[in-house]
């Protein structure tokens, strides 16, 4: 049995991970560590399990991190935005010699923490990074197709959408602005390249996609997630892309338009004698408008889907496999928090291979993940009369375009 500390345990993702872990026999203790300590206590009180307690942590105060993680077997880091928080947290955890899981989805800092591999190995630490939905589940489903379904895999395309969460924090909005502002890596024609969200090369990659259980012709946009960088390191591929969106479309459009107008900038401007940071205003404005947009569009409950499309050859013929993880009543919190909790559980079971800083495809057996997450999410679905989770849906598309649903 393992003691787990969940950093950022009060957030949309962290709180789901806390609740999931608290219900697992293999987990002996869960500490909800958050800057909002009172909210952490309230969450622990709602769960009402002797396993769950609360603690204070500040991602930018190393001593508070060290205090919060003391005595843990595994630390799960859910504190965003990761481009500013993950390095000091991972440094503190590695220095303490504790195994680590996170849901980091910022590609730029992912490259930086992968460079901490030698440091983690020297301390005997296993650090599983990007263990959410995308990245996370996507990496493992891509690996599953590559290892077991296709003789040759040419391309992996990752598509995702979600929306309607009960809460969204400032870090989530900041992450979206960040995603639209930085170079977006895409692995095309066997080479890593970069496109820009608002420039013609990025606009050319926009498309629509039919997400099972969610809707048809959902617009999706280039996303700077880590899969495009990490998957080609471990799998011989010619293409890896990542595209996504947030629902409803009107809400995503607001975020996109504010960013396009320059309101994601962090340099203060003078407004009638007051120094105002456009980014801070835009985040606050988005969070205020979100409730109005959800009401206006009739978006009354969360939903989400993450799809992995693997294309290549099987028995000398073109073949495509499509994995979908879809839900009509779960979204970012569950879609990311439950895979993260499963990553922690696999760590506690001793099923994560090796030491160092590694993405999922480097150290997790895909079927270990698929079997465990299917069990956990189906149990969670009972909260919503069985509507919550559609399971891991697998489809095959043959050379004639005929789609067949398969069992995993």
Give the ranges of each region predicted by the language model.
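Conserved Rossmann-fold cofactor-binding substructure of NAD(P)-dependent oxidoreductases
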Residues: 56-71, 81
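Rossmann-fold NAD(P)-binding glycine/threonine-rich loop
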Residues: 103-126
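N-terminal Rossmann-like NAD(P) cofactor-binding module of classical short-chain dehydrogenase/reductase
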Residues: 73-77, 100-101
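N-terminal Rossmann NAD(P)H-binding glycine-rich loop of SDR-like oxidoreductase domains
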Residues: 6-20
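C-terminal catalytic/substrate-binding lobe primarily of soluble NAD(P)-dependent oxidoreductases
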Residues: 148-408
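Short beta-strand element of Class I
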Residues: 29-31
